[in-house]
């Protein structure tokens, strides 16, 4: 989950969006929760097994 925290930091300091690496569904759910707690927006993109989370600012 360290990569999620790094991506959250990048988005909160100015990067428009960040794509995380593809992960299984249970990991993506945890990523979405961390992103929501940081008051950012996230969406999943792609098809399994390459589905990934993208983080945006509000």
What are these regions (language model features)?
Residues 1-58:
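Intrinsic disorder
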């Amino acid at each position: 989950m360290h990569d999620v925290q790094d991506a959250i930091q990048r988005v909160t300091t100015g990067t428009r969006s960040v794509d995380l690496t593809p992960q299984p569904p249970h990991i993506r759910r945890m990523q979405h929760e961390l992103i929501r707690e940081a008051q950012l927006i996230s969406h999943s993109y792609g098809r399994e097994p390459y589905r990934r989370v993208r983080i945006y600012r509000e």
